[in-house]
Curated annotation (Swiss-Prot):
Pfam families: Ribosomal_S18
HAMAP family linked: Ribosomal_bS18
NCBIfam families: S18 (TIGR00165)
InterPro entries: Ribosomal_bS18, Ribosomal_bS18_sf
Span list, region Disordered: 1-21
Biological processes per GO annotation: translation
Gene that encodes it: rpsR
Biased composition (Basic residues): 1-18
Source organism: Methylibium petroleiphilum (strain ATCC BAA-1232 / LMG 22953 / PM1)
Record-linked SUPFAM superfamilies: Ribosomal protein S18
GO annotations of cellular component type: cytosolic small ribosomal subunit
Function: Binds as a heterodimer with protein bS6 to the central domain of the 16S rRNA, where it helps stabilize the platform of the 30S subunit.
Lineage start: Bacteria, Pseudomonadati, Pseudomonadota, Betaproteobacteria, Burkholderiales
The name this protein goes by in its record: Small ribosomal subunit protein bS18
Subunit structure: Part of the 30S ribosomal subunit. Forms a tight heterodimer with protein bS6.
């Protein structure tokens, strides 16, 4: 008799288990720029841009920050401009 559908050869579920407790306490994400009434993001505002860059230097995705798509596109463009003008580093690790 074949194993039940959705499970592997030995009856184990292939999908990783999620922590159900963390799902209960998840805070609702909101767009910071919409709440404050910002119409355009400035590439010279480095303090704001740093909040949306991860520790490894990557731009944090909108699904984690809650930023609307309109502002996420502006944000990524501004971060890239600030990096090009040396206002922000490309990565966090610089070998000296």
């Amino acid at each position: 008799m074949p194993p039940p559908r959705g499970k592997g050869r030995f009856g184990k579920d292939k999908r990783p288990k999620r922590n159900t407790q963390s799902l209960l306490f998840r805070r609702k994400r909101f767009c910071r720029f919409t709440v404050t009434g910002v119409t355009e993001i400035d590439y010279k505002d480095v303090d704001t841009l740093r909040d949306f860059i991860a520790e490894n230097g990557k731009i944090t995705p909108a699904r984690l920050t809650g930023t609307r798509a309109f502002f996420q596109r502006q944000l990524s463009t501004c971060i890239k401009r600030a990096r090009f003008l040396a206002l922000l580093p490309y990565s966090d690790q610089h070998k000296s």
